[in-house]
Regions:
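Non-catalytic DNA-recognition/assembly elements of restriction-modification systems
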Residues: 2-32, 50-103, 195-202, 206-242
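DNA target-recognition domains and sequence-specific DNA-contacting regions of bacterial/archaeal
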Residues: 37-193, 241-251
């Protein structure tokens, strides 16, 4: 069983690394503007091909948000994406199915009907604020959430990383129950990168998150296998050689 545990741990560690890569790339391109700084100093952006590098300017200009890459517009968050309240689904009406239910605190079971197409991005609206979730599958965002109904100049992976940077707790409009008003988020001033650059980031980040999804599925399968085999092995229903054969096939 230790081989199973090791494989599950490795998959989870790999996913943490992959997710960190997508986040670091976003911050480098759209927050710290590292490629622009490199070009302004006469250097080629590190680890970047010429076509992608050409999408970045080679200087900065003053704006109401401070220094921003030359030519990039200043707008509001709603120029990038539109948030919408999720859909009510009482527990008594839920039927287990293929589509994830996403609450303010994260995935919360499944349902046989989806209300939104994936890839999608969801954050908490009521109860739990500040968590942001990316799903590549069709899904049902519950009514305690806000989900990205429309990607304007943003894409799914770009929106995911952008929303993770926001301090949603500071927008709390509730009293006893933390509540997020989407209009407060929509009106935030934000620098708007060229659509071509956002799409270039999406091409890289989406492939990363697809790998994460595949690893999660494999880890889930292995976890279910471990939880099935272990009681049978302990009870004597399954012999060790038989267990080892099953593990070899799984791994």
């Amino acid at each position: 069983m230790s081989a199973l545990d090791d494989r599950i741990t490795l998959l989870r560690e790999t996913n943490a690394t992959l997710e960190a890569i997508a986040q670091v790339l976003f911050k480098s391109w759209f927050v710290d503007f590292d490629p622009v700084r490199a070009k302004a100093e006469g250097r080629q952006p590190e680890g970047m091909d010429a076509i992608t590098a050409a999408l970045f300017p080679d200087s900065f200009e003053e704006s109401e948000l401070g220094l921003v890459p030359k030519g990039w517009e200043i707008g509001e968050l709603q120029d990038l994406l539109v948030l919408q309240r999720g859909f009510d689904l009482p527990a008594s009406e839920r039927t287990e199915g293929a589509y994830p239910l996403i609450a303010a605190s994260g995935p919360s079971g499944t349902h046989h009907i989806a209300m939104a197409k994936g890839p999608g991005v969801v954050t908490g609206r009521s109860g739990v604020l500040g968590k942001v979730f990316l799903t590549l599958e069709d899904y049902w965002p519950l009514n305690t959430t806000l989900w990205v109904k429309e990607f304007r100049r943003a894409t799914s992976c770009y929106a995911f990383e952008l929303l993770k940077l926001l301090d949603f707790a500071s927008f709390n409009a509730g009293s006893a129950v933390p509540t997020l008003n989407r209009n407060h988020v929509h009106s935030l001033k934000y620098v708007l990168p060229p659509v071509e650059l956002v799409e270039s980031y999406e091409g890289t980040a989406l492939s990363i998150h697809q790998r994460v999804l595949e690893n999660n599925r494999q880890a889930q399968t292995l976890t279910q296998l471990r939880d099935t085999l272990l009681p049978r092995l302990i009870s004597g229903q399954l012999r060790l050689p038989e267990t080892e054969t099953l593990l070899e096939k799984a791994l």
